[in-house]
Amino acid sequence: MAAGPTTATDGRPPAPTGAASRRLALGALLVVLVGWSLTGLDVTVDRLLGAPGDSWDIFRRMFPPAFAEAAERGVVGKVFESVHIAWIGTLIGALVSLPLAFLAAGNVAPAWVRVPVRQLFNVIRAVPELILAMILIPVTGLGPWAGALAIGVHSIGTLGKWATEAIEGIDEGPLEAVAATGGRWASSMRWGVLPQILPVVTSQWLFRFEINVRASAVLGMIGAGGVGSELVSQLVFRNFPAVGAVLFMTIVVVLSIDTAGP
């Protein structure tokens, strides 16, 4: 009697499909990339195994936090200076990015305008706030103004992209209604688009403000205002109780802003 066709039930695994082969190749590529990255970072097994213990030792030395010493050094004022930097930077980003977003959205702007504005957003997002602050410090001098401008410029790229996506996701009905009444482009944006995107864009601004508070603390490390300069100073002298106080106050402020948000 002739043997029937061979099936997967014969005990042999089925031949790998194209999708399975691609997943296997992708997994192998990821393993190679991780190994290559670790080699480039000069990471050794001893350092990896010792990292948890070293981190715990530093964390333990931060307690109890030296709140009295931090208050004497004006850390509270520096923390709120970081908040002020973040607020001004977010305001700059919001005011500039929203009009540009109308020029970048594919459903309301022509390609000859849309493409350059989108590329502008991409270029801005490609430069970190830290680099922007280093570029601006020779112009503005050391202090919070450089930090606020750096955060503001970077926020334009991020908020502009988010607002563009919000505009492209609107209901086209109100736009058609305004156009049917003879309204021009500006009227369509004012009455057909803005009411739809404003709740979303407002929440994006608040979210970006939370991010900017954390970014402003980092900018202080290069002299761009905020609490970062005090944090670096205490780390250099290995005054970990004071470092703990600075970090605690910064975390409390960030959590308070997050709780107060929508």
What are these regions (language model features)?
Residues 121-155:
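Generic hydrophobic transmembrane alpha-helix motif, especially the helices
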Residues 88-121:
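Transmembrane-helix boundary motif in ABC transporter permease subunits
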Residues 109-111, 126-132, 213:
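Transmembrane alpha-helices and adjacent helix-loop boundaries
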Residues 203, 244-262:
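C-terminal transmembrane helix and the adjacent membrane-cytosol boundary/short C-terminal tail
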Residues 142-208, 262:
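Membrane-cytosol interface at the C-terminal ends of specific transmembrane alpha-helices
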Residues 76-84, 117, 121-124, 206, ...:
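Alpha-helical membrane-interface segments at transmembrane helix boundaries
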Residues 1-91, 103, 107:
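N-terminal, non-cleaved signal-anchor transmembrane helix
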Residues 138, 213-250:
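Glycine-rich helix-loop "coupling/hinge" segments at transmembrane-helix boundaries
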